[in-house]
From Swiss-Prot:
<feature type="binding site">
    <location>
        <position position="273"/>
    </location>
    <ligand>
        <name>ATP</name>
    </ligand>
</feature>
<dbReference type="Pfam" id="PF01406">
    <property type="entry name" value="tRNA-synt_1e"/>
</dbReference>
<comment type="subunit">
    <text>Monomer.</text>
</comment>
<feature type="binding site">
    <location>
        <position position="238"/>
    </location>
    <ligand>
        <name>Zn(2+)</name>
    </ligand>
</feature>
<dbReference type="InterPro" id="IPR024909">
    <property type="entry name" value="Cys-tRNA/MSH_ligase"/>
</dbReference>
<keyword id="KW-0436">Ligase</keyword>
<protein>
    <recommendedName>
        <fullName>Cysteine--tRNA ligase</fullName>
        <ecNumber>6.1.1.16</ecNumber>
    </recommendedName>
</protein>
<dbReference type="GO" id="GO:0005524">
    <property type="term" value="F:ATP binding"/>
</dbReference>
<feature type="short sequence motif" description="'KMSKS' region">
    <location>
        <begin position="270"/>
        <end position="274"/>
    </location>
</feature>
<feature type="binding site">
    <location>
        <position position="213"/>
    </location>
    <ligand>
        <name>Zn(2+)</name>
    </ligand>
</feature>
<feature type="short sequence motif" description="'HIGH' region">
    <location>
        <begin position="32"/>
        <end position="42"/>
    </location>
</feature>
<keyword id="KW-0862">Zinc</keyword>
<dbReference type="InterPro" id="IPR014729">
    <property type="entry name" value="Rossmann-like_a/b/a_fold"/>
</dbReference>
<feature type="binding site">
    <location>
        <position position="30"/>
    </location>
    <ligand>
        <name>Zn(2+)</name>
    </ligand>
</feature>
<dbReference type="Pfam" id="PF09190">
    <property type="entry name" value="DALR_2"/>
</dbReference>
<dbReference type="InterPro" id="IPR015803">
    <property type="entry name" value="Cys-tRNA-ligase"/>
</dbReference>
<dbReference type="InterPro" id="IPR032678">
    <property type="entry name" value="tRNA-synt_1_cat_dom"/>
</dbReference>
Amino acid sequence: MQPFVLYNSEQRKKVEFVPRKEGHIDMYVCGMTVYDYCHIGHARVMVAFDYIIRFLRSQGWKVRYIRNITDIDDKIIKRANENGETIQQLTTRFIDAMNEDAANLGCLAPDEAPKATEYIDQMQNMIGNLVNKGAAYPASNGDVYFEVTKFEKYGRLSGRKLEDMQAGASERVDVEVEKKHPFDFVLWKHAKENEPSWASPWGNGRPGWHIECSAMSTCCLGNHFDIHGGGSDLMFPHHENEIAQSEASTGEQYVNYWMHVGFINVDGEKMSKSLGNFFTIRDVMEKFHPEVIRYFIVSSHYRSPVNFSDVALKEAKTSLTRFYHSFKAYQQVYGQTTTEALDQSFIERFNNAMCDDFNTAEAMAVLFELNKELNRAVKEEQADQATVLYSTLRHLTNILGLVQHNVDDFLKSDIGQDALALSDAEIEDFIQQRVDAKKAKDFAKADSIRQSLLEQGVVLEDTRQGTVWRRAD
């Protein structure tokens, strides 16, 4: 088992991973609130932790992966009422849709997917423990709040000082006169008319959002576990509040390592329904093969913000198609012949990239070089070497969950064919990128852009007057 480093959000640096139990990793990732179809931001979180777990398991780690489902929430109640259906009908439908989307993206199912409504008793036990310890208090209206000033380390994950904080619009913090401090957060909400509720020592009601994850994670993995993950938007207040209530309740450190996946912007702007640039996974799959979406996500480092656009998806399709063409060229000559003797130099370079905070951008660069060597070996009819390189490439793409479809079926797929046609403006933009690359003497990038355009039906010709282009016949 090769040692690896990961970026711990709490420490704000890359650190070497040390397991609580030798050879084992317990991981909890915040899942979806199931009131609508999953969007591309959800896709990134699902895919990122999927390839991370695939890689760790390929290294011999025994990973226990928990991803929760929030099936009781203000948004769920509102949507069910708008639709005139029960909460269970709504959540069941969108849980099924979520699982279908995840499967289409090539994501393995988590070892366990606890639902919030299945852990109400455990949530109440944790809340009662916090009240008994003086870290939480019941309000006169039946709500129960966590008292943030009673937890000295509050703000350590997000790097915020309590006195400097200001509530943000997206922070899901209820502002109530019953609070002792503006940042006290609700653990138990009193029952309201036409809302689901459960009996409790504080009256009928339902759990707050944050307590759900603390109860589910500790019930599934214990009071102290290895890795907690989620989207960057959850760092504050959700994960900050999880730490406070969990550690105040158990008296133990909650999590050793925090991992957060970066944002997805759409055409340079934050994805938002109000901006009209909000896309569900299903929206995107109408234009692009789901493995193209996965490739787009895998090709960037999980912590880096990425820009989602049709151009980016077209580039992803072109790049992914290269691997399929290489596999097809090999299979036409050698069939499905493989060998257990893999090229260890490529394996080592790939593993080194992934062991450095799961650097898939660097890992993909290794795969492109390997793909190029495979094409050369097939062209030069070097059968033994071609088989080793093909087997190595297949092994490594499997770890990333790529090139998982039948070669001919993928290449014949018409998903996204209309979207693949580059506009004139997009072509001119690529040409300018190529000019800039040549000026910087980055000839490899310049050649890559030329080849990418050629594969998309655009022919470049360099003349004394500059580069001209035409669409291939």
